[in-house]
């Protein structure tokens, strides 16, 4: 959530920065904001006036009572006037509280302001390539045979989309045998790198969170259509009271970042570095017809998430560091990739600046997103009331950052396609071999003998 003081001081500048973002409608109803602000100022000025008058009259009452019977009549009149002022003050306080709630609701739908270093653009075409990497420095590998996509490669290894549809529906899949083992190996490898080499604390979190947690990280109220709501005690989530509604997590960023909700940290405790491997659940409400084949866009997928809670002075340094932590996974796996600086029109709701890592997929002959690393500055912290006690002993909002380290399913896609062989087998990347019993090659003939 934006700092309302910034809007009050320089509304025109805020509007100009917000207009560089992509949206089918205005992010901020400026007329409503100005109307509420005008009423708030009027009520506050009137309140201060009434409080001053009440204080003056209260002193008069004491002086009149000191006169005894001679001042009784006048004292009673002044007391009646004070009682009237009290009633008006209570009415004003109630309305002022309502206005604050209306302003807060208005701000909950406003995205973060782009950092000055973010390129201005309308959509993904405005994103800027920062750097690219490949094992030999010459770009993606050239194959001397016709490449297959991950569906054709993975199906003989145990990738089963038809069974996923049978069990649940479209955009769900089942993995069995070798492919399931490779998927697990990727997740374990990612966790080991993030915890053992990059210093993150591994966490296990609930896969279901409450509405307050979703609001804290910015998924609610604006993106409820993208979430899977859970039933509680036979009650439809939509019918449940707001704070009792439950949702499947779209990313473990939500529970991990909420660790510091309503917490005041000591400055010495910063940075807080957390990671978790969880399933993620997304309705993909706006993705009808896109990536309908394969694992690229699923309702359920696994991801290893990185979250850092940091001192505000360190957040942009940390953004570069976390991007490097995600890159390290791709480099260790030997997967060609590029780093993109997202433009204003392509950034997520809560981000001030975002880097996307895109991995090369030979069958698509293009790069596809596999990680997104974002600095949210104080945007989430303000919603969460996540603070630290600074050197002056005052409570100050932390900055929050999050990133994928990495999306496990898409990493599986990249390994299958980049390490495929002409006979349909897949060479196991050197970094993953300890996690698959030392196997160097996975092929259909090595499929586990499973009675299905």
Swiss-Prot record:
Keywords: Aminoacyl-tRNA synthetase, ATP-binding, Cytoplasm, Ligase, Nucleotide-binding, Protein biosynthesis. HAMAP family: Ser_tRNA_synth_type1. L-serine binds at residues 251-253, 305, 404. Catalyzes the attachment of serine to tRNA(Ser). Is also able to aminoacylate tRNA(Sec) with serine, to form the misacylated tRNA L-seryl-tRNA(Sec), which will be further converted into selenocysteinyl-tRNA(Sec). Homodimer. The tRNA molecule binds across the dimer. It comes from Albidiferax ferrireducens (strain ATCC BAA-621 / DSM 15236 / T118). ATP binds at residues 282-284, 369-372. Consists of two distinct domains, a catalytic core and a N-terminal extension that is involved in tRNA binding. GO terms for biological process: selenocysteine biosynthetic process; seryl-tRNA aminoacylation. It holds the Pfam family Seryl_tRNA_N. This is Serine--tRNA ligase. Pathway: Aminoacyl-tRNA biosynthesis; selenocysteinyl-tRNA(Sec) biosynthesis; L-seryl-tRNA(Sec) from L-serine and tRNA(Sec): step 1/1. It is found in: Cytoplasm. It catalyses: tRNA(Ser) + L-serine + ATP = L-seryl-tRNA(Ser) + AMP + diphosphate + H(+); tRNA(Sec) + L-serine + ATP = L-seryl-tRNA(Sec) + AMP + diphosphate + H(+). GO terms for cellular component: cytoplasm. Belongs to the class-II aminoacyl-tRNA synthetase family. Type-1 seryl-tRNA synthetase subfamily. Its EC number is 6.1.1.11. It is an enzyme of class 6 (ligase). GO terms for molecular function: ATP binding; serine-tRNA ligase activity. InterPro entries: aa-tRNA-synt_IIb (IPR002314), aa-tRNA-synth_II (IPR006195), aa-tRNA-synth_II/BPL/LPL (IPR045864), Ser-tRNA-ligase_type_1 (IPR002317), Ser-tRNA-synth_1_N (IPR015866), SerRS_1_N_sf (IPR042103), SerRS_core (IPR033729), tRNA-bd_arm (IPR010978).
């Amino acid at each position: 959530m934006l700092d309302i003081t910034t809007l009050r001081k320089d509304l025109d500048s805020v509007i100009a920065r917000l207009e560089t973002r992509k949206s089918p409608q205005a992010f901020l109803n400026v007329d409503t904001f100005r109307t509420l602000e005008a009423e708030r100022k009027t009520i506050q000025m009137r309140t201060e006036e009434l409080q001053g008058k009440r204080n003056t009259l209260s002193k008069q009452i004491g002086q009149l009572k000191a006169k005894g019977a001679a001042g009784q009549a006048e004292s009673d009149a002044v007391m009646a006037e004070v009682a009237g002022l009290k009633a008006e003050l209570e009415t004003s306080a109630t309305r002022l509280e309502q206005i604050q709630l209306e302003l807060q609701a208005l701000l909950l739908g406003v995205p973060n302001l782009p950092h000055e270093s973010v390129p201005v653009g309308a959509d993904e075409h405005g994103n800027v390539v920062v750097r690219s990497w490949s094992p030999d420095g010459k770009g993606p590998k050239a194959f001397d045979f016709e490449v297959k996509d991950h569906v054709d490669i993975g199906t003989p290894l145990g990738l089963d989309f038809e069974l996923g549809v049978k069990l649940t529906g479209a955009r769900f899949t089942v993995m069995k045998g070798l492919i399931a083992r490779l998927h697990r190996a990727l997740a374990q490898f990612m966790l080991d790198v993030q915890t053992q080499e990059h210093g993150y604390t591994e966490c296990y979190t609930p896969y279901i969170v409450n509405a307050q947690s979703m609001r804290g990280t910015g998924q609610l109220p604006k993106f409820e259509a993208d979430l899977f709501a859970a039933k509680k005690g036979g009650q439809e989530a939509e019918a449940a009271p707001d704070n009792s509604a439950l949702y499947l997590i779209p990313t473990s960023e939500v529970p991990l970042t909420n660790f510091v909700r309503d917490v005041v940290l000591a400055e010495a405790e910063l940075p807080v570095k957390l990671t978790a491997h969880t399933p993620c659940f997304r309705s993909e409400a706006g993705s009808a017809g896109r990536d309908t084949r394969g694992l690229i866009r699923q309702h359920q997928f696994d991801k290893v998430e990185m979250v850092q809670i940091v001192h505000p002075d360190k957040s942009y340094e940390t953004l570069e560091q976390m991007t490097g932590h995600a890159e390290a996974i791709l480099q260790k796996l030997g997967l060609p990739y590029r780093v993109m600086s997202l433009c204003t029109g392509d950034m997520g709701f809560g981000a001030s600046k975002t880097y996307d890592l895109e991995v090369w997929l030979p069958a698509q002959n293009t790069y596809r997103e596999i990680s997104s690393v974002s600095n949210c500055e104080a945007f989430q912290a303000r919603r969460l009331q996540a603070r630290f006690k600074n050197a002056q002993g005052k409570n100050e909002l932390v900055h929050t950052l999050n990133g994928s380290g990495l999306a496990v399913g898409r990493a599986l896609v990249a390994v299958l396609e980049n390490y495929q062989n002409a006979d349909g087998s897949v060479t196991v990347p050197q970094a993953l071999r300890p996690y698959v019993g030392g196997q160097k090659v996975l092929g259909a003939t090595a499929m586990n003998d499973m009675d299905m």
